[in-house]
């Protein structure tokens, strides 16, 4: 049977063939054109062509007409002995004639109403009926019998018909394919099994979901066969590194995309879900937040931070015997004078060698001893000679002595000498390996004030030494190479040599040629340098430099070239364009860099600047690896870039320096800041010269003006920050230098506060609050594992962001906050106004205010000496002042006094006790009114608040009046310190009360129930703490946004804090009732509140103070903004790079469900 026959039972009986088809198959011998194959076997010609057509599945001429002429001939011409074209043409001709006849018959039938009628038509003449013309609906009547119900599956325009026709069309196309073609049933095995039900036909689904289902099914089959059937498809995609679109984490994408639709980040969610937000957050939590801000999955982070497989230099014994010579290191840093530098060994257990530079040495080389280890952990010791090679070009003048101070190229030379290794012996058990790091180090002062010179590395060169017998294969020398290249580039180690070709590299990495040029900083992306910078390294101004400046290892390609010479570039070779200076080590860096660039969506030169600047701040990262501090810095950058549009150039200048470099066609960032406009006759040039910033005239004053113009600050602000920079850099008093360090410090001090909407002065005040160091930002940041969160630059920036936003929300300023916290203290200078103030209080304490014995001379009080009794029991003092009555929540002063009087036990007569209480209350009110009126008039605070204000600052009405009476000043010199301190405290607390609009109800709650606020240290003092001020603002914000009034809030707190015995706790659980009450106040779901309290670990699960309720309100805000439940927000707050895949998967699905609930189906 022919492969094109789709029928299951072939009709072989000739009598069943259509007569017309038989006629079409009738070919006259004289017009038959036989093929060469037919001529060799003429017996086949006698076979009936009609039987052949039947065998091919054609029973009528219409079956042939359904197929195109070209396809019919291609399929059957050979089977029909070369008559395919003739038979097709005859069949189509006959089919057209039959169709025409059919249409003519239908037209004749449709004209039947025109025939003259003989019944009941006598009113119409026969002539008019005969001459009547046909109408359109008569000529073209609707074929109602062929119609079906609109929307029915069997309709011609239904999805089922379209799908069926499409499916048949694909089958017909596949018939023309070769036997090796992948047919639809192979590519989409689900389609033949698809049930044409209502869901399949009418339910709208995205093309992406179909693609995902198909690909997941295919991937599942492959995974099941690879022995990883226990892992989900998405988990495998995260563990796979090739192609370069992987690793892919669906949960991470869901979380980032879902939260992004609500304009929020995962790091922000983690911050707000943390109960300690935001002043007491631990360093571990900040690390979690910063890594979350990268928006990278744990698999992506793992790929970036994996230990290096290769070293910068792989040296075999043969290469060392010939003498290895490194690239020159003098040209590495443009901003440093490297005329005097050398090479030292990084100390390690398996290495012995020089670890410090030596000023003068008579030895021509140093010996480095390496302990090399084979696969069986057996060791040998190898000695290498290390030399500092200088390339010096003499001038043509004779008798010019060698000048060791001139700039010249320096290179490290390593040599294996057989005489130094007589015991090396047999290497059959090899190869033996050893890793070694060598520093290029410069001479520097130990610190800014020391004369002691020490070695400070500025470049790390990594080596892997392989000692093996002659003829060792590459697989033996680099056994780890094959797995690396297969996993990351899809090639074996042997085939990896193809990556040097530009086309092959682009194919394996998914990069275009122009993208590779940008990556390598070549072609149209060459680095350029500002013309307004004179670099400290003198080699670039001499004839000793044999390379263009700047080079890619200075800017644009620093990371991928490991900050070393012989930078990669594109050259033309016989086989096409190639990448020069490519190595396994650089391929490993390119592997990380290309992926990271796509994940962060940054141009290559900007990402390189970002990475290398961060690495400069990473003190223990001389090898320039992507470490955890680097990743955290990238997270902070991505957050600031998203929220504040901070560019890589700005962020890099914060961590290191303003860059003087750019790529072709752009302006260096340094010039964009300080030379963007021609305001002066000459541009601002970094020439390394010093200037006095205190001068008002001359060239030094011009430098100050240029700096002020570039930073967009006033001269007053500059004079405020200049001493901070001078102190941080150890410069002479009143002096700065036109250098990268100085301008970068000034830029940090100005730009970081501006990012968060603060002035420079306010930013420094805020930094002083956070770090206890005003000039913290003047110093270049340095990451150190020993740093606490109080000194960690990245954490401090996050704190500064949160603190500035909180201050703005509550109408506070950094200056006022510093005063409230006591960080900044104003000088208290006694004045005549103070004397008048205290004299007024003393003079007001007349007999109408102070109690006397006469006040108790009443008939109702006879029988007891109440003056003596009250004085003895510390209710009043000898001067008639009522002693302090400590307030209690829920009790009035009258009740407190009554309890005090009753405790004396003199009389049980309620009438007598009531009279005593009334006398005392009148006196107490008079004394409070006197002091309140005076303080209110002087400080502008509400009179009713004054008694509570005095108690809050650690004093009380009685204490103040007593001090005034005993120490009434007569002049400025007689004002005692306690009274001066009182005026200062009153000023500070008045500022807090007025700024936050605090009423006496809140202050009374603060004094009597500090635990309801959540204060861990409720002690009253003249100095406020940041947690207390923060909780006060939380309370105020709660009151303003509550669904109930402040009394309801107090009632809830009172109910939630009812103390119970253990037996009562067992019998009665008020948690649900508390959740319901709080739900009414917050206008939120009680179940969510109860769940939040349980997640917080409260026992019983009920919020009892403002600290806990503020945390619940933060969850409420997040939940309402994102439509994510409390439980999943809590899980989101626990997400780290080490979290289980199942946890991330659950959170990702919850985020997508919440996004769909918001009606955003496009992003689901």
Curated annotation (Swiss-Prot):
The keyword Plastid does not apply. InterPro entries: Insecticidal_toxin/plasmid_vir. GO terms for cellular component: extracellular region. It is found in: Secreted. It comes from the Bacteria. Keywords: Secreted, Virulence. Toxin complex is secreted when grown at 25 degrees Celsius or less; at higher temperatures the proteins are present intracellularly but not secreted. Part of an orally active toxin complex (TC) with strong insecticidal effects on larvae of the Coleoptera Costelytra zealandica, Acrossidius tasmania and Adoryphorus couloni and some Lepidoptera larvae. The TC has an endochitinase activity. Semipurified toxin complex consists of at least YenA1, YenA2, YenB, YenC1, YenC2, Chi1 and Chi2. The Yen-TC:K9 subcomplex is about 26 nm tall and 22 nm in diameter with 5-fold symmetry and 5 copies of YenA1, YenA2, Chi1 and Chi2; the chitinase subunits may be solvent accessible on the exterior the complex. The Yen-TC:K9 subcomplex has no insecticidal activity. The native complex with additional YenB, YenC1 and YenC2 subunits is 16 nm taller and is insecticidal; the toxicity-conferring subunits are present at about 1 copy each. This is Toxin subunit YenA1. It comes from Yersinia entomophaga.
